[in-house]
Amino acid sequence: MVKRSLLVLALLICLPATLFAQYDYVRISNPFLHKIPIAVPLFQALTGTEPEVKAAQSGADLLADTLEFTRYFNLINRAAFLERPDRTGVTLADIDCKNWRDIGAEFLITGGVTVAGGMMEMELRLFDVFKERMILGKKYKGKPVDQRKMIRRFCAEVMEQLTGTPGIFESRIAFISTGDGSKEIYACEFDGYNPQRITRNSSINLSPAWSSDGQWLAYTSYRKGGPDLYITHLTENRGTVFSKEGINIAPSWVPGQFMLAATLSFEGDQEIYLLTGSGTVVRRLTRSWGIDVSPTFSPDGKRMAFVSGRAGSPQIFIMDMGSGRTQRLTFEGGYNTNPSWNPVNDTIAYCAMTGGAFNVRVIDVKTGATVALTADQGDNESPSWSPDGSLIAFSSTREAGVSRIYVMTAAGTDPRRLLILPGEQTGPKWSPAVAAGR
């Protein structure tokens, strides 16, 4: 659990709420997004000590990299700056906004760092260089090792001011890695930083799924021989093992509830059931002769998409959780799996077999219109949305046929490898906006 007592946050200047209402929020799901031009000069070491100079450099670089990862900020190259790094002011009175407008910036972030007595203070400000005013000012205090947390939190504040959502900066991504020869579940921060091992049983562990509050992780493990469900609290030593005869696989949490769906076969056929988070079967959800797997829920939890073989091949269906009425969603192609419902709207990312390879597509639930996001780069599978719906994590064999995890925009642009780890990495699952274990 994050020890928030180590990190103290104070507002530098209180601004009237009406000031922020004048900004038009950026639509982060817009595939034709005009990236926001922003400048992040080196921070100022306020007393000039060596630890401050190092912290100022690393802090500015980390903040720029963090914003750039979102794909909707255009970071102005520091080589284009008209001001010398050591003369860039921290407050509005010390800033020549024209110098920043002339190089194409619309916004400017400045920072000042103090390191003394084993503690760090960081002042961060966001300015609109066209309106020549400060939008946001924050002061953070903590240990030097807390610098990344300070930067993450400020980036969330910047995002909320400019887009209306705090973004992804406190989210995590769970995944499967074979680095030690077995399939273990790991979790890292949204940008691949700090990968941590979750399971340690030298067995096969699959299908990690986050609860809505980011505190619980459900997954399938073969540690006792057969596929059982494990429901584990990430910061406390407690949880549940769900083990019925047959298979117990593919968990998915119901949004806003301590309940999940999973595929079980204790009654013979592989059907989807609703369970409590403590492992009690509530009711059976599907009833068909074909295998039903891979449940995923709409943002309000009122509908469930899943994969079924009832049509003769794997296709995605949608069930109304109230009435039980089910309708087929995918019709194009003979193999469609791995559905992931966008947490903010009615689109579903999924994996389709096209041209002998697996590729990621997105389908509009209302219209049935599909868009291909990957093609001609190996197998691309297991898509998972970021909590704000702006990015998609997925696994791909595009590099030498070895499965790695990548992140791309919701429009399929700007794919980047997330992690550099031994072995293969598969099955990414993005957490809600805030997740435990950071």
Swiss-Prot record:
Gene3D superfamilies reported in the protein's UniProt record: Dipeptidylpeptidase IV, N-terminal domain, TolB, C-terminal domain, TolB, N-terminal domain
Signal peptide: 1-21
GO terms for cellular component: periplasmic space
GO biological processes: cell division; protein import
Keywords: Cell cycle, Cell division, Periplasm, Signal
Keyword Signal recorded: yes
Transmembrane segments: none
Keyword check for Nucleotide-binding: no
Top-level taxon of the source organism: Bacteria
Stored Pfam families: PD40, TolB_N
Coiled-coil spans in chain: none
Family matches, as SUPFAM superfamilies: TolB, N-terminal domain, Tricorn protease N-terminal domain
Family: Belongs to the TolB family.
Complexes and interactors: The Tol-Pal system is composed of five core proteins: the inner membrane proteins TolA, TolQ and TolR, the periplasmic protein TolB and the outer membrane protein Pal. They form a network linking the inner and outer membranes and the peptidoglycan layer.
Role noted for this protein: Part of the Tol-Pal system, which plays a role in outer membrane invagination during cell division and is important for maintaining outer membrane integrity.
Annotated HAMAP family: TolB
Protein name: Tol-Pal system protein TolB
Gene, per the UniProt record: tolB
